[in-house]
């Protein structure tokens, strides 16, 4: 799904939704300013937007391209946050593609924003270069309540250990209580005194 929006940037934050209602996705995002004035950009989750007072903005000259990918099977809305000290027009183009859900045995589930290719002269002076803005749950398991805890081997190892200790204690108590014969000392009625 391709979409392109023309946005007027100023000192007030402009929020552009990236993934709509998709859970796992890959989005190629391109922002092109109409002037050479720098603007600030951040890509954050809705949770980070609501909980953080200072966003990880990157200063961009003219244009930037980046890829936002989420494949951790957890719905989280992501937004592109834009603002500028100088009023200017910008065109935001988002090419959004749904990626398949990852099974529980899959590895490498992550949310990543890949650094864009160099734009401009490419000499590393900040022209269109932005570092990853947000990385979450790299290689980790889903943290929502739907995680199937009973499939974890550690859970079953603890259960087996507890069962082994209980069986050991039961066998030990049974061995000590009923199998030993009491010692009987017979006394003769007749004494040799």
UniProtKB/Swiss-Prot annotation:
Protein localization: Membrane
Predominant place of localization: membrane
GO CC entries: membrane
Superkingdom, natural source: Viruses
TM spans (from-to): 153-170
Topology relative to the membrane: Single-pass membrane protein
Keywords in alphabetical order: Membrane, Transmembrane, Transmembrane helix
Name of this protein: Uncharacterized protein 234R
Lineage: Viruses, Varidnaviria, Bamfordvirae, Nucleocytoviricota, Megaviricetes
